[in-house]
C-alpha cells in the first residue's frame, strides 16, 4: 500500500511539472522539450567532419552517401536518445534537481556520445571502405592497433575543436534547460492565485 501512495505522489509531481512547463512561452518550452535534438544535430555534424577527415587520409573516393548517412544518422540518434534519457527526462520528472549535476551530465553526454563516439565510429566505416576499394595500404595482422592509432592521431587533433564545442554547447544547453525548469516551477497555477 505504501508503494502505491509513493507512486501516486510521483505521478502528481510529474503531472504538476508538465503542466507548469506548458505555461512557458513557446520558444522556451521548445528549448526545454527539444534540446536533445540540437545536441544530436551537432553530433551528426561531428560525425560528418570525422568521416571526411578519415576519407581524405585513407584516399576513399567512392561510396560518399553510403558512408555519410550512417555517419550523420547514427550519432544523431544515439546522442538524441542519450541526452533525453540522462538529462531531459530526469529534469522533467524532478529526478535531476541540481544545476551542477545537470551541467555535468549534459557536458559528459556531449563529450562522450556527441563528440568522441562519432570519431570512433568513423574508423571502422572508413577502414572497411578502404579495404573494399583498396584505396590505402592497410596493415597486416600484427600491427593493426598501431596503424589505427597512427592514422587517427591527426584526425583527433583536427577534431579537438568540434569536440570541445559540442561539449560546451551541451553543458550550456543543460544549464539553460535547468534554469527554464526552475522558472517554470516558480510560475503560479492559473486559477490558484494567492491574494
From Swiss-Prot:
Mitochondrial matrix side: 1-33, 78-110, 176-195
Subcellular location: Mitochondrion inner membrane
Tissue-specificity statement: Strongly expressed in brain, cerebellum, skeletal muscle, testis. High expression also found in fetal brain, fetal retinal pigmentary epithelium, and fetal retina. Highly expressed in retinal ganglion cells.
GO biological process: one example: protein insertion into mitochondrial inner membrane from matrix
Coiled coil stretches, renumbered: none
Highest classification ranks of the organism: Eukaryota, Metazoa, Chordata, Craniata, Vertebrata
Segments on the Mitochondrial intermembrane face: 55-56, 132-158
Keywords from the named record: Membrane, Mitochondrion, Mitochondrion inner membrane, Transmembrane, Transmembrane helix
Outcome recorded upon mutating residue 36 to L: In OPA7; likely pathogenic
Family: Belongs to the TMEM126 family.
Function: Protein required for the cotranslational protein quality control in the inner membrane of the mitochondria. Associates with newly synthesized polypeptides and may act as a chaperone that cooperates with OXA1L for the insertion of newly synthesized mitochondrial proteins into the inner membrane. Required for the assembly of the ND4 module of mitochondrial complex I.
PANTHER family associated with the record: TRANSMEMBRANE PROTEIN 126A (PTHR16296:SF4), UNCHARACTERIZED HYPOTHALAMUS PROTEIN HT007 (PTHR16296)
Bilayer topology: Multi-pass membrane protein
Description of how the protein assembles with itself and partners: Interacts with OXA1L; promoting cotranslational quality control in mitochondria.
Annotated GO CC locations: mitochondrial inner membrane; mitochondrion; plasma membrane
Disease with which this protein is associated in UniProt: Optic atrophy 7 with or without auditory neuropathy: A hereditary condition that features progressive visual loss in association with optic atrophy. Atrophy of the optic disk indicates a deficiency in the number of nerve fibers which arise in the retina and converge to form the optic disk, optic nerve, optic chiasm and optic tracts. OPA7 is an autosomal recessive juvenile-onset optic atrophy characterized by severe bilateral deficiency in visual acuity, optic disk pallor, and central scotoma. Some patients manifest hearing loss.
Any single Pfam family the record assigns to this protein: TMEM126
InterPro entries per UniProt: TMEM126
Protein name: Transmembrane protein 126A
Transmembrane spans: 34-54, 57-77, 111-131, 159-175
